[in-house]
Design a protein with these regions (language model features):
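Secretory targeting and sorting signals
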Residues: 1-22
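Extracytoplasmic metal-acquisition and chelation regions
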Residues: 18-287
Length: 287
């Protein structure tokens, strides 16, 4: 029952790696301040914070686009050249943005989320799954667009509610054992009090697109064999070794690096807050 409901909910909340239509470019707002974000996740955060003051576009909105190896187009460079504010994840996640900004003859205000958050360079760069760090980034975005209305306060209030939901899971020890195929959601797992049973060598190999060794694969299978262990996999990544783990496993859900889209229409089904809330809901599902 868990698997069935989890997969249905994941298909609504998260991007499918096998969308049947071409994903639609992401943009929001119509204000005079032009914001360009590296991904639609950060674009959504910017839109929620800037409100009516800005128009926001994202360069990456398709699960087939890998931020680590993304090759920007001339159109992408023009978008950055015309931007008033540029938002990037940083931490080695979207280095293509550094090159685009460097080539801009009239540099925009740059918000580097990883740098703003103060995260150690050796830490996980997927900081949009850490609601505390996103709050700090939101303040930097608000300062960049000189936003003094209620948008920032409303966004931070929503983040506080998500944090409260995570704390509830942690105190109640609800989450339990989770095997995450990649470290993308590690911040969320920590905040929810989950027991991350993923062998480090496994997640590192998958993230670096290398084959997992037979010995590590055996460790992974043993970890998943423990009753109550949930398999969390990145739905934009395909791997025969991940498929082996998924085969026949009961507790399973997907997580993404981009905003949710309808697999049939390509339409967006939610914003950043919806995405994180959906992931938290899955972590707290009774198994």
């Amino acid at each position: 029952m868990f698997r069935k409901i989890a997969l249905v909910l994941a298909s609504v909340l998260l991007i499918s790696g096998c969308t049947s239509v071409e994903p639609k470019p992401w943009s929001a707002g119509s204000g005079p301040i032009k914001i360009v974000a590296s991904t639609d996740v950060w674009g959504s955060v910017a839109n929620l914070v800037a409100g009516d003051r800005a128009s926001v576009t994202a360069l990456i909105y398709n699960s087939s686009q890998d931020p680590h190896s993304f090759e920007p187009s001339v159109r992408d460079q023009l978008a950055v050249n015309n931007a008033d504010v540029v938002i990037m994840n940083g931490g080695g996640y979207d280095d293509f943005m550094t090159k685009l900004v460097a080539a801009d003859p009239t540099p925009a205000i740059v918000v580097n989320a990883f740098a703003v958050s103060g995260a150690d360079k050796s830490r996980n760069e997927h900081i949009w799954y850490d609601v505390d760090q996103v709050g700090a980034v939101a303040e930097a975005i608000a300062a960049a667009v000189k936003n003094t209305d209620s948008s920032l306060a409303s966004f931070k209030s929503s983040l506080a509610k998500l944090k409260e939901k995570l704390n509830t899971l942690k105190v109640a020890n609800t989450c339990g054992r989770v095997f995450a195929t990649e470290p993308v959601i590690d911040y969320l797992l920590d905040d929810a009090g989950c027991v991350n049973v993923t062998p480090l060598a496994f997640s590192k190999a998958i993230e670096e697109e290398r084959d997992v060794s037979p010995a590590v694969m055996e460790q992974a299978k043993n970890a998943l064999a423990v009753p109550g262990t949930v398999l969390a996999s990145n739905i934009s990544v395909t791997s025969s070794q991940i498929s082996q783990l998924e085969s026949g496993h009961v507790g399973e859900f997907g997580f993404g690096e981009l905003l949710p889209q309808d697999p049939d229409t390509g339409a967006y089904g939610g914003n950043y807050l919806d995405m994180i809330d959906g992931s938290i809901t899955m972590l707290g599902w009774k198994k």
